């Protein structure tokens, strides 16, 4: 009987030493159990059938506790683990915004023990969009970033004319210039080369040169119209050559107010077009009379360009003052023509 009491006293001393081993810490940083309590042992008849175990508060004095029977690894882990958990929890609380931060149990006065992993899991369930609390792994891409990239609309970096590989080509440029002097058209027609003048038919001298291959209409008022050039530079060069011919004939001609009045371009979209459907859909801008003219006339508002559209896919653009207006008009009309492509 005395031997059993001795064993019981040794067991109680060990339990008391184990209860006094762990330092007091907050329930928030406890990794396993919320409170230190007596461990139920079936060999102890006093505690095996006790349904309400008694909670014991630990003290902070460890001077009287003998820790020699425990290994150093367990003691070191128990000492280091609350520090690591506290450091991780402070980083998570700082990274979270003030509105999304979960209150600690000490603020709510609730005696629940939560470790750092359960806190992060509960926060990720409540706030799935918060990327600060859960860091994505480097092997697995972030699904949120992929979804945002897929939602963002992509705009083409190149104009439509370059995307489809079709660029309108300039076919004719009409320009005007003022020679600023009165002219004798009969004298010009008699002495100039490649010039003709028929006042009953047309009240201007028609003069032609080979390089650049153009035609000029010279009026007695000193105004001149130059047609047939393929570029702006060629049109200006041809007008200067005509003015030089007039100067050599003894007229005080000058070169004033040169201006491009009209540019004509053409292209081929390389597919047949349903003109009947196009004129029904865009009747405000187009007119189509196949008995009078085989092409559809489309009057674009901005830029102010007139387009002649044919069934074969050929398109003529006219009425532009600048080259960019030709390109812009074709970029606007090409998606419309593609919608009326013949099957």
Swiss-Prot record:
Biased segments, Polar residues type: 143-152
Gene3D superfamilies registered for this protein in UniProt: TATA-Binding Protein
Keywords, comma-separated and alphabetical: Cytoplasm, Developmental protein, DNA-binding, Nucleus, Transcription, Transcription regulation
Annotated GO MF terms: DNA binding; RNA polymerase II general transcription initiation factor activity
Compartments it resides in: Cytoplasm; Nucleus
Any one Pfam family match given in the protein's UniProt record, by short name: TBP
CDD domains referenced in this protein's UniProt entry, alphabetically: TBP_eukaryotes
Compositional bias ranges of the Basic and acidic residues kind: 76-90
Ranges for region Disordered: 71-152
GO cellular component: cytoplasm; female germ cell nucleus; nucleus
Tissue: Ubiquitously expressed in all tissues examined with highest levels in heart, lung, ovary, spleen and testes.
Biological process terms in GO annotation: DNA-templated transcription initiation
Keyword check for Cell membrane: no
Compositionally biased residues, Low complexity: 94-127
Main function: Transcription factor required in complex with TAF3 for the differentiation of myoblasts into myocytes. The complex replaces TFIID at specific promoters at an early stage in the differentiation process.
Subunit annotation: Interacts with TAF3.
Stated family: Belongs to the TBP family.
UniProt cross-references to PANTHER family, sorted A to Z: TATA-BOX BINDING PROTEIN (PTHR10126)
UniProt xrefs under HAMAP family: TATA_bind_prot_arch
UniProt name for this protein: TATA box-binding protein-like 2
């Amino acid at each position: 009987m005395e031997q059993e009491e001795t064993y019981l006293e040794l067991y109680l001393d060990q339990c008391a030493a184990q209860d006094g081993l762990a330092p007091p810490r907050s329930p928030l940083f406890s990794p396993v159990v919320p409170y230190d309590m007596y461990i139920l042992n079936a060999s102890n008849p006093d505690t095996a059938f006790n349904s309400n175990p008694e909670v014991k508060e630990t003290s902070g004095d460890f001077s009287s506790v003998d820790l020699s029977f425990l290994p150093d690894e367990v003691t070191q882990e128990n000492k280091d683990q609350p520090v690591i958990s506290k450091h991780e929890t402070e980083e998570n609380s700082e990274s979270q915004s003030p509105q999304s931060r979960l209150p600690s149990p000490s603020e709510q006065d609730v005696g629940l023990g939560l470790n750092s992993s359960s806190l992060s899991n509960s926060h990720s369930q409540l706030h799935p969009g918060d990327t600060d609390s859960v860091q994505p792994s480097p092997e697995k891409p972030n699904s949120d970033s992929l979804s945002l990239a897929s939602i963002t609309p992509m705009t083409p970096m190149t104009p439509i004319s370059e995307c489809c590989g079709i660029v309108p080509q300039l076919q004719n440029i009409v320009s005007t210039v003022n020679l600023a002097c009165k002219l004798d058209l009969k004298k010009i027609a008699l002495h100039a080369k490649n010039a003709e003048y028929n006042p009953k038919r047309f009240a201007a001298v028609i003069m032609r040169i080979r390089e650049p291959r153009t035609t000029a209409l010279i009026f007695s008022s000193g105004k001149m119209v130059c047609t047939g050039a393929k570029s702006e530079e060629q049109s200006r060069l041809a007008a200067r050559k005509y003015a030089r011919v007039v100067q050599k004939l003894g007229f005080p001609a000058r070169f004033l107010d040169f201006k491009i009045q009209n540019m004509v371009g053409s292209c081929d979209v390389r597919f047949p077009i349903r003109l009947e459907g196009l004129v029904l859909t865009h009747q405000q801008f187009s007119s189509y009379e196949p008995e009078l003219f085989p092409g559809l006339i489309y009057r674009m508002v901005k830029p102010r360009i007139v387009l002649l559209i044919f069934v074969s896919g050929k398109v003529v653009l006219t009425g532009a003052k600048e080259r960019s207006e030709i390109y812009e008009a074709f970029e606007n009309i090409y998606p419309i023509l593609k919608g009326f492509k013949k099957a």
